[in-house]
Amino acid sequence: MATLRAMLKNAFILFLFTLTIMAKTVFSQQCGTTGCAANLCCSRYGYCGTTDAYCGTGCRSGPCSSSTTPIPPTPSGGAGGLNADPRDTIENVVTPAFFDGIMSKVGNGCPAKGFYTRQAFIAAAQSFDAYKGTVAKREIAAMLAQFSHESGSFCYKEEIARGKYCSPSTAYPCTPGKDYYGRGPIQITWNYNYGAAGKFLGLPLLTDPDMVARSPQVAFQCAMWFWNLNVRPVLDQGFGATTRKINGGECNGRRPAAVQSRVNYYLEFCRTLGITPGANLSC
């Protein structure tokens, strides 16, 4: 019995020691708006802690160990949402210099080289009521970041591994001889998505899905249709929520490199626009 009591005592001491270590290295406090204690780092994802995950690459404030410039904290009142100020018209946010800077990275061997244009993007955006007034700069940075990732930095306008993507549907039946593989900057797929997008936009996309790959304006319109329907409702939850809506299969540690690719695009565009990214960047 004495041996058993000693073993239990040692196990309890070890448990308390583990809790102490965890308390020193992992913190759930969000620092996007409130900041961290003086001895803690604010991570790229907006949480306080002391390990390399907090103080390394992307560290916003505190005793950062990364050699890169820390990301500024979210200003008071900005919260983590992508619909927060600052705002401006779509033309003033997506300037020729900003858009051309994105497209300058499209390689000469890319199938979509020269396909996506600023004129098409602006025209597509202005066909939606949501973008006819002023828009949140964070939302546009997030939108272009997700479009960049999905299209391979705007290298592609059509999916490489093409399939039929035909699902039985009474409302949007497949047209014989037509395939509904990914097209456009967000790679819209399946007959029911082409049908619903076409109905909303007033375009015959169910019978002519290739229109998305022929017209840059239609390509952006389809992507923005998907964005407004599925992504825009979660803008107040931060950039990570947009990734979950577009491809939730990457989240919860399943495809961290893909998630980070999206985050990197977003941070780059935020820097270009001179805005802070907000909190909750990952999913």
From Swiss-Prot:
S-S bonds: 31-42, 36-48, 41-55, 59-64
Keyword Disulfide bond: yes
Record-annotated Chitin-binding type-1 domain positions: 29-66
Annotated segments matching region Catalytic: 88-283
Known glycosylation sites: 280
InterPro entries named among the record's database cross-references: Chitin-bd_1 (IPR001002), Chitin-binding_1_CS (IPR018371), Endochitinase-like_sf (IPR036861), Glyco_hydro_19 (IPR016283), Glyco_hydro_19_cat (IPR000726), Lysozyme-like_dom_sf (IPR023346)
Gene Ontology cellular-component annotations: apoplast; secretory vesicle
Active site as annotated: 150 (proton donor)
GO biological process: cell wall macromolecule catabolic process; chitin catabolic process; defense response; polysaccharide catabolic process
Any one GO molecular-function label of the UniProt entry: chitin binding
EC number(s) on file: 3.2.1.14
Catalytic activities: Random endo-hydrolysis of N-acetyl-beta-D-glucosaminide (1->4)-beta-linkages in chitin and chitodextrins
Family under the similarity heading: Belongs to the glycosyl hydrolase 19 family. Chitinase class I subfamily.
Listed name of the protein: Endochitinase At2g43620
